[in-house]
């Protein structure tokens, strides 16, 4: 080849790409990553069938973030990085709805005390529809009426360009930046047949589980909790700082098309819903349907009313729509509502009644809860006679008093609560009032003005309620810690109420699961001082149980005239105690429950802030009771879903000598919690920069904590003794309690398994089960659902509520439903109960 040829001259330049080439490549790769990540999000949120692991998604996401940082001008409007939120706004712009966002007419089906519905209003709706169609026979679609915030999403050329709240129906607020953080709202529509323009109407809401997690974080951060998921969703969507919205998991379900140009032209509403899913939206699968007549609609409505408490989201009824879009147009609108749709509300969950008295209940942790005793009222399908007032702050805020007419709410299995007072109905009394003449009089001045009969004013009949100063059960002082909303009885296990509630919790199905020992028997044992501590349960015998039974049943007349249950009369006429089956069953239940799973045992102890989930986290992180007992607070605070407040509560519990003595007594009585597989890797909570950053009274970032660790030679001895460390650290470690904490940390980590040991299963992990995802469906022959879940989790597996491509096994019992069908369709392995037990070993 001629070295002077012009091809050879340009070869070097070809090896070095120009700035425009780099930019073109970056633009192409950004487009590729954006499309790829949006497709993965669609598979995850809409199809519930992810095709890549989370780690792969995260890796690609970080790659896209880096490219966009280097080339901000190339960032696309549908980039998934927008879901983390942007800079705060000064305010929300107004958006005028081209198609008004109208409301629906309500229909109600009252339910009598026998649970029978009166569907007269729905039959009337059906008749109006038929009349409007000149006797035509409509089909109906019924779907959930979500208790959230209505919004409108506008897409142009498949890209989300605007999101607006309903507002007054004509004008709403532009919340586009916030809506882009909602994970299951597509930023770019999917599929090939996307319209040039489409405006999708739907509801933004917060799932019940996400609401509970948010309120837990609010409480841990000393912030006011939200009253309900709807308020939480509305407040989150209207944040000026979209980064806050991004932290609060919101969800969206579409329910109608306001306008559309191009794309698939639906003839029925049920087709619209299917089109939504094809475009990338999520649907409330299994909770909507199309039916041929109103009777089928009402049957589904009643089924959904029963199913309501189990749903992952709040609904307050069902929306019924004429399916045919042509028939919808024919029926048209009346005022500001369509004739072809109705909001079929569930039976009232709120009702008016009168507060007859206010007293208090003492919980197992000593919490003093004011309770309103009510005139019986039928609400939410049951007769309600009591309602919680939560705490003194809530009583004062709502100003609930004896005699007040109040609104009571009961939703699903939630404890009834007093929502508000109807102040105009408050009972009043007339009282004399002295009117001053403006002249100062001595106390004995004969001319000083005195109240006259006609100088009166109305004042409330009853004074504002205040909690008692002493426990009504044990007379111990009621105390309220600074910053706490709840007041507590200081009596501990000396208080019969706390003792009874603590023992009931200890023996409950989700805790120690002591078969045969119910609330009634525990209350009787406590009332007679036969059981003072948890360990006393394991010292019970038949004579003690018989004594409990006889004392509880005995009346003055019976004690002289007739033998009690479990006794016989001998020739001498004296009562002779005989063993009875019920007592033997209780003792057998106590004995069989002596080897609980570690998570159940921890939950049973009644540690404040430790529910089932937190107990499982502790068991999975530490593996043995001894490690949990000795876990230092900073290490606890590093665990998933355990913040500083919960960590402090756990550490405080195990730091108390009486609690350690109580556990020792249980162990001495033969209780032996099982060893749990360590399935949360130690690195999750043992990385030095993490626990150092969580040391009490020493504020430091994780980056600075890492630097401190390296300065100390990467060992705790260095933290304890190195004199070259920063002065603020040396001052902190010089405090006796902090020096003791460092020594505790050193001892604790010496006993914890290493990362490799945990991975190799040195703590009894079942390698065939560890890290696998199981779904349970149907009724198993011998195991209850929670028993099967506990066995799987104890072996290191996970249990999910839905089937996806991530599912490893579906355990199917009798009457397995749609989960089994989906598992077969996805090729997921199906196990019987026997096969599960074999796998578990």
UniProtKB/Swiss-Prot annotation:
Q: Where is the active site?
A: 145 (n6-amp-lysine intermediate)
Single GO molecular function: metal ion binding
Which residue windows does the record flag with biased composition (Polar residues)? 561-570
Which InterPro entries would you find in this protein's record? BRCT_dom, BRCT_dom_sf, DisA/LigA_HHH, DNA_ligase, DNA_ligase_AS, DNA_ligase_CS, DNAligase_adenylation, DNAligase_N
Tell me which Gene Ontology terms the entry assigns under biological process.
DNA repair; DNA replication
Enzyme Commission number(s): 6.5.1.2
Gene Ontology CC terms, in alphabetical order:
cytosol
Which keywords accompany this UniProt record?
DNA damage, DNA repair, DNA replication, Ligase, Magnesium, Manganese, Metal-binding, NAD, Zinc
**UniProt-annotated stretches for the region Disordered:** 554-575
Q: Which residues bind NAD(+)?
A: 54-58, 103-104, 143, 166, 203, 321, 345
Q: Where is the BRCT domain?
A: 764-841
Asked if the record carries the keyword Ligase, the reply is yes
PANTHER family in alphabetical order: CHROMOSOME TRANSMISSION FIDELITY FACTOR 18, DNA LIGASE
Family, per entry: Belongs to the NAD-dependent DNA ligase family. LigA subfamily.
The protein here is known as DNA ligase
């Amino acid at each position: 080849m001629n070295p002077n040829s012009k091809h050879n001259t340009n070869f070097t330049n070809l090896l070095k790409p120009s700035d425009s080439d780099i930019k073109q490549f970056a633009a192409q790769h950004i487009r590729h990553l954006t499309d790829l990540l949006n497709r993965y999000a669609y598979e995850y949120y809409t199809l519930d069938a992810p095709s890549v692991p989370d780690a792969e998604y995260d890796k690609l996401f970080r790659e896209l973030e880096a490219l966009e940082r280097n080339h901000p001008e190339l960032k696309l409007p549908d980039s998934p990085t927008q879901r983390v939120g942007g800079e705060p706004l000064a305010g929300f712009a107004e958006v005028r709805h081209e198609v008004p966002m109208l409301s629906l007419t309500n229909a109600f089906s009252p339910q009598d005390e026998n649970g029978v519905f009166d569907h007269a209003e729905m039959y009337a709706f059906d008749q109006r529809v038929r009349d409007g169609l000149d006797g035509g026979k409509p089909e109906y679609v019924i779907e959930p009426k979500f208790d959230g915030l209505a919004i409108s999403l506008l897409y142009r050329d498949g890209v989300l360009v605007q999101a607006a709240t309903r507002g007054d129906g004509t004008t709403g607020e532009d919340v586009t930046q916030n809506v882009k953080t909602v994970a299951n709202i597509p930023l770019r529509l999917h599929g090939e047949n996307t319209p040039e323009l489409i405006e999708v109407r739907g509801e933004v809401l917060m799932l019940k589980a996400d609401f509970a997690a948010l309120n837990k974080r609010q409480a841990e951060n000393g912030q006011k909790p939200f009253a309900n998921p709807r308020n939480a969703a509305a407040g989150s969507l209207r944040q000026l700082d979209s980064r806050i919205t991004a932290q609060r998991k919101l969800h969206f379900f579409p329910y109608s098309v306001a306008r559309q140009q191009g794309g698939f032209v639906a003839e029925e509403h049920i087709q619209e819903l299917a089109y939504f899913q094809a475009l990338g939206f999520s649907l409330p699968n299994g909770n909507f349907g199309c039916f041929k007549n109103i009777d089928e609609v009402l049957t589904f409505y009643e089924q959904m009313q029963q199913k309501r408490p189990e749903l992952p989201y709040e609904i307050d009824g069902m929306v019924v729509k004429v399916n045919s879009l042509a028939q919808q147009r024919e029926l048209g609108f009346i005022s500001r509502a369509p004739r072809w749709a109705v909001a079929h509300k569930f039976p009232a969950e709120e009702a008016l009644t009168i507060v007859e008295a206010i007293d208090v209940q003492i919980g197992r942790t000593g919490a003093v809860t004011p309770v309103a005793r009510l005139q019986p009222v039928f609400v939410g399908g049951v007769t309600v006679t009591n309602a919680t007032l939560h705490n003194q702050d809530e009583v004062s805020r709502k100003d609930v008093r004896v005699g007040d007419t109040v609104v009571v709410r009961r939703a699903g299995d939630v404890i009834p609560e007093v929502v508000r007072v109807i102040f105009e109905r408050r009972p009043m009394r007339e009282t004399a009032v002295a009117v001053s003449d403006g002249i100062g009089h001595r106390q004995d001045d004969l001319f000083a003005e005195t109240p006259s009969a006609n100088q009166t004013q109305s004042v409330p009949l009853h004074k504002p309620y205040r909690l008692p100063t002493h426990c009504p059960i044990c007379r111990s002082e009621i105390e309220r810690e600074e910053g706490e909303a709840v007041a507590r009885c200081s009596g501990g296990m000396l208080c019969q109420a706390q003792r009874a509630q603590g023992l009931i919790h200890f023996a409950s199905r989700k805790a120690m699961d002591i078969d045969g020992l119910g609330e009634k028997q525990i209350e009787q044992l406590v009332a007679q001082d036969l059981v003072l501590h948890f360990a006393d349960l394991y010292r019970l015998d038949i004579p003690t149980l018989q004594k409990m039974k006889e004392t509880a049943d005995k009346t003055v007349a019976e004690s002289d005239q007739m033998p009690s249950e479990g006794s016989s009369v001998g020739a001498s006429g004296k009562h002779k105690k005989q063993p009875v089956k019920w007592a033997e069953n209780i003792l057998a239940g106590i004995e069989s429950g002596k080897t609980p799973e570690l998570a159940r045992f921890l939950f049973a102890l009644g540690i404040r802030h430790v529910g089932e989930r937190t107990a499982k986290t502790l068991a999975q992180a530490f593996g043995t009771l001894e490690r949990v007992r000795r876990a230092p607070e900073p290490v606890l605070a590093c665990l998933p879903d355990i913040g500083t407040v919960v960590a402090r509560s756990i550490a405080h519990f195990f730091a108390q000598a009486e609690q350690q003595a109580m556990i020792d007594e249980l162990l001495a009585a033969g209780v032996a919690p099982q060893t749990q597989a360590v399935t949360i890797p130690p690195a999750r909570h043992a990385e030095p920069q993490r626990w150092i950053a969580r040391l009490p009274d020493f504020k430091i970032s994780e980056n600075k904590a890492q630097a401190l660790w390296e300065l100390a030679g990467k060992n705790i001895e260095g933290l304890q003794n190195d004199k070259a460390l920063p002065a603020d650290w040396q001052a902190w470690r010089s405090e006796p309690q902090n020096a003791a904490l460092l020594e505790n940390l050193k001892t604790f980590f010496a006993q914890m398994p290493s990362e490799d040991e945990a991975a190799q299963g040195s703590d009894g992990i079942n390698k065939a089960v560890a890290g696998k995802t199981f779904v349970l469906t149907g009724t198993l022959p011998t195991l209850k659902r929670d028993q099967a879940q506990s066995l799987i989790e104890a072996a290191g597996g996970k249990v999910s509520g839905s089937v996806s491509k991530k599912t490893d096994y579906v355990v199917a019992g009798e009457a397995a439903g749609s989960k089994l069908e989906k598992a077969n369709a996805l090729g997921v392995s199906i196990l019987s109960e026997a096969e599960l037990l074999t796998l578990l070993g």
